[in-house]
Amino acid sequence: MPAEFLKIHPQTPEPRKIQHVVDCLRGGGVIVYPTDTVYGMGCDIHNARSVERVAKIKGIKPQKNDFSFICNDLSHIADYARVSNAAFKLMKKLLPGPYTFILEASNRVPKILNTNKKTIGIRVPNHAIPRQIVLLLDNPIITTSIKDDDDIMEYPTDPEEIFERFQHQVDIVIDGGYGGLLASTIINATTDDFATVREGAGVFASN
């Protein structure tokens, strides 16, 4: 059965549509959704089967995943990661925004996401759709690129093209308008040195 192609207003998401997406996630669904950078693929982080499904779509072993996840705000982050005072100040300055922070994972991170590295990537995007989804779901959602790591092509930006590509692999593709071309900037905040792991859409000068 093909995925549902669901148009949602990017600035003022319709509550009934957000509820529909959340119901899908609670039922083990996998979605493709817009962010403040590129389109992402995700599921409820507490549904191991759904996480495994995302890993299969990405062509990786679940135990080898490096999935990040989306939180609604800074207080939500503190539930899943250990955050130093310096890291909190930096995140308060930069978030919501196009950044992924690598942090030490807390015990609340599901085992399937807590790889041997014991760290986790966390985002608070400056985009209403994913944050409203997370807020209503009351759980973070996985965020991983819809582009393969070894794919030399640019990130897909047209929601209709994205739907054509993933309609037989996911449950809902959200059309929130055209996506960006740059992924998030990744900052390692496991120490207070704050090293840039990957340059992306967010501007940040490492210490």
Predicted regions and their residues:
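Active-site-adjacent structural elements in enzyme catalytic cores
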Residues: 1-207
